[in-house]
Amino acid sequence: MRNALIVGINNYPGHELNCCVNDANEVARLLEYNKDESRNFSIIKLLDEQATYDNILDKLTKVFNDDSDVSLFYFSGHGYDDKNDGKICTIDYKSQHYGIPFRTILEHIRESKCKNKIIILDCCHAGKLGNFSMIGDATILECGTTILTACNTCESAIETNGHGLFTKLLIDALEGGASDIFGRITPGSIYSYIDSSLGSFDQRPLFKSHVQSFVTLRVANEKMSFVEMRTLMKLFSNEKATFQLNPSYEPTNYPGSKEIGKEDLKKPYFQENNGKIFGLLQKATSNGLVRPSNEKHMFYAAMNSDTCELTAIGKHYWWLAKNKII
């Protein structure tokens, strides 16, 4: 089971925000289904007036108080810094309690039997959730826990163009910007995508994790299938090997071709079986796994009987295939 609590609050009395409900709806939409429309997370969504102190705590307990494979909490709204702890501000905040303390959220995580526990906060001062020296030793990050926040302890989270800046990048990451070659999106790849998209003067996301391996949060469109990847890696006897090409691999190299003039045709002419292999190699090239050894383009590598080779990332996947990890 994969469960998620998604909270977005715009209508704070006297302190309205513009983008949080929109952010929550988009994150919920993306997490509920994978790109191929297969079911992903079961979603509980609390928006504006639904997002009271008691209601959020009740649903937080429901989402994290079982042995699910993945439990996720996303919050978009106001954050509050009271020196000793941070808080997410609920719709019914009052001067005596501005919302739910980060300490309380971490205690729910600590008590959870869920295998993978993920907290994503898009609010000001959210980075305090990862500052355990302020929250106390009782809430040291449990195994299987990942925290991703929009900004660091003393920073504000920014809204821009209909979304929070952080969540806009989170949405792009979940759409596929943070996917690997097989379409898998993990908390680590999301953080890397967001961090690399922000300038040095922008708010800085915080990422803390205590896991043995990252869980896949969503599957977007794959760039290559597992079958294609295994087939590709069999073309190279080792990670440093090259693959010999010749004109028979180039699909436009045949008598009567409209793409290549008669004087530029070369023997051996195109062969269908070699063309299938070349198509796979070109797909791998477009995804950064293979490159021509000496030519600028794969077309010239084939027509000039040159070779192609694995890139650094291609060598990594070759190793994964060799060791039957993929």
Regions found by a protein language model. Give the residues of each.
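Accessory beta->alpha helical hairpin/"wing" motif in late/C-terminal subdomains of nucleic-acid enzymes
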Residues: 223, 287, 291-326
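Caspase-like cysteine protease fold
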Residues: 4, 179-270, 305-316
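A short, glycine/acidic-enriched catalytic loop
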Residues: 16-22, 48, 55, 78-112
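Active-site-proximal C-terminal subdomain of hydrolase catalytic domains
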Residues: 8-9, 31, 118-208
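Functional beta-strand-loop-alpha-helix junction segments that form "active/interaction loops"
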Residues: 28-69
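Short glycine-rich His-centered loop
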Residues: 1-15
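Glycine- and acidic-residue-enriched helix-capping/strand-helix junction motifs
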Residues: 12-26, 160
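Short amphipathic alpha-helical interaction segments
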Residues: 270-292, 305
